[in-house]
UniProtKB/Swiss-Prot annotation:
Highest taxon above the source species: Eukaryota
Protein's organism: Homo sapiens (Human)
Localization: Nucleus; Cytoplasm
Listed name of the protein: MyoD family inhibitor
Matches recorded under InterPro entries: MDFI/MDFIC (IPR026134)
Length: 246
């Protein structure tokens, strides 16, 4: 009833337990018609290097100080050292001057003052100090001149005219004083020793000048008026003080 073919299936040729050859895709489809079999082609040659690259990426970097092994960079190695800002940026090419405490000048000035304190020359400051004395003297003379000018300018015009009048009167009073002295000499007749003295020896009411023929023209009452009047005496004393100040 059944026809036995001369060809035996390949699965029967292999002994029991031996792996048989893999069936072809057509056989697998015919044997399992109700199942969907994925017939994607696998590439073992390409999968192998991909797995190797994944293993290389997954393997951690060896740590150690041995030669030839690259060391991992630390985060501290990437930090750049920062410098503290001590001054404001300026356009001066010389840079910032060092900060100095309060009440302290430039180092060169400090050195100059120390040298001056030790007895050395302090620079042009000493010459300036020496030159101040004549200037002060000239200023004092100028002040005195200006003060005298101011006092003369402060005197009003009327007062200046009065001064001139007083000077004229004082000169007249001085002449009057000399006249009074002559009259006094004539009244006493103490200075009538020469021949020309007969003019001064002719006083009224005196008999000593009998040899003199000239009449007595002088009034002896002038002397009495000058001596009796306190005002005239005071004026004469003032005139004497002005004329004979020495």
């Amino acid at each position: 009833m059944y026809q036995v073919s001369g060809q035996r299936p390949s699965g029967c040729d292999a002994p029991y337990g031996a792996p048989s050859a893999a069936p072809g895709p057509a056989q697998t489809l015919s044997l399992l018609p109700g199942l969907e079999v994925v017939t994607g082609s696998t590439h073992p040659a390409e999968a192998a290097p991909e797995e190797g690259s994944l293993e290389e990426a997954a393997t951690p970097m060896p740590q150690g100080n041995g030669p030839g092994i690259p060391q991992g960079l630390d985060s501290t190695d990437l930090d750049v050292p920062t410098e503290a800002v001590t001054c404001q940026p300026q356009g001066n090419p010389l840079g910032c001057t060092p900060l100095l405490p309060n009440d302290s000048g430039h180092p060169s000035e400090l050195g100059g003052t120390r040298r001056a304190g030790n007895g050395a020359l302090g620079g042009p400051k000493a010459h300036r100090k020496l030159q101040t004395h004549p200037s002060l003297a000239s200023q004092g003379s100028k002040k005195s001149k200006s003060s005298s000018k101011s006092t003369t300018s402060q005197i009003p015009l009327q007062a200046q005219e009065d001064c001139c009048v007083h000077c004229i009167l004082s000169c007249l009073f001085c002449e009057f004083l000399t006249l009074c002295n002559i009259v006094l000499d004539c009244a006493t007749c103490g200075s009538c020793s020469s021949e020309d003295s007969c003019l001064c020896c002719c006083c009224c009411g005196s008999g000593e000048c009998a040899d003199c023929d000239l009449p007595c023209d002088l009034d002896c009452g002038i002397l009495d008026a000058c001596c009796e009047s306190a005002d005239c005496l005071e004026i004469c004393m003032e005139c004497c003080g002005l004329c004979f100040s020495s």
